[in-house]
Amino acid sequence: MSSTVEFDPQSRPTEADAYAQTSLPEVLPELVKQSLPKHVAIIMDGNGRWAQTQGKPRVMGHKAGVKAVRRAVSAASQLGIQSLTLFAFSSENWRRPDKEVSLLMELFFTVLQREIKLLDKNQVKLNIIGDISRFSARLQKQIRAAEEKTAGNSGLILNVAANYGGRWDILQAAQKLAEKVETGEMTSSQFTEEALSEHLCMQNQSEVDLIIRTGGDYRISNFVLWQAAYAELVFLDTLWPDFDEQAFHEAIATFANRQRRFGLTGSQIDEMRAL
């Protein structure tokens, strides 16, 4: 049986999907808009369970999840968030049944083909993070083409984590630095936190401010471990295909109402704000 993934016509992007066409939500107070995170990361969990509740195959949940991705990108773009990172396929997901993995790879290829024009139109810069060497040559070629097409865009940076793991990211950065030390390009004393950060997948972006996880679980699943050292965490029971702009805005409002201390006391933060 063919593993080709077909989209229903309603799932395809249209002119009405242009992100700039929807105004900012009135539900967000001005204070929240002033406290927006620069970098939001989302663990998109619950596709399979959503499909099961609908009496459908798991792949239908992944297909429905594509629409939620579009809504999240739209909401982030409208709010002026700098970076949005989506956990699409972890390095541990290869352990899933071969048929599901094959369908996910085909879905990834199809989505890259069909969404890239909409992303480019809305000035979204696509960045695939992770070890893509394990993907087929066909998929790797499509990834490079999509990244190249949007490379010059100045809007939202959309990082899609594919065959990604937080530990892998730290390890590959450390290995690059170790090689530089070995070849004499740098000394061991220059092996610093800053140097390591510069060799991670998202080296030119701000650290993650907010992690949103859908699906009702309370863990970060080896996702952006280094970059999320001081991130606020918001866990939602909502299954990913049901995630919409309202859920995104509510998570942003939750973030804005928290006091981020970075090791300081609450009193110190209040004093700094009063200056």
Curated annotation (Swiss-Prot):
BP GO terms, sorted: cell wall organization; peptidoglycan biosynthetic process; polyprenol biosynthetic process; regulation of cell shape
Catalytic reactions of this protein: 8 isopentenyl diphosphate + (2E,6E)-farnesyl diphosphate = di-trans,octa-cis-undecaprenyl diphosphate + 8 diphosphate
Keywords, in A-Z order: Cell shape, Cell wall biogenesis/degradation, Magnesium, Metal-binding, Peptidoglycan synthesis, Transferase
PANTHER family in alphabetical order: DEHYDRODOLICHYL DIPHOSPHATE SYNTHASE 2 (PTHR10291:SF0), DEHYDRODOLICHYL DIPHOSPHATE SYNTHASE FAMILY MEMBER (PTHR10291)
Functional summary from the UniProt entry: Catalyzes the sequential condensation of isopentenyl diphosphate (IPP) with (2E,6E)-farnesyl diphosphate (E,E-FPP) to yield (2Z,6Z,10Z,14Z,18Z,22Z,26Z,30Z,34E,38E)-undecaprenyl diphosphate (di-trans,octa-cis-UPP). UPP is the precursor of glycosyl carrier lipid in the biosynthesis of bacterial cell wall polysaccharide components such as peptidoglycan and lipopolysaccharide.
Annotated family: Belongs to the UPP synthase family.
Protein name, entry field: Ditrans,polycis-undecaprenyl-diphosphate synthase ((2E,6E)-farnesyl-diphosphate specific)
Species of provenance: Shewanella oneidensis (strain ATCC 700550 / JCM 31522 / CIP 106686 / LMG 19005 / NCIMB 14063 / MR-1)
Organism placement in taxonomy: Bacteria, Pseudomonadati, Pseudomonadota, Gammaproteobacteria, Alteromonadales
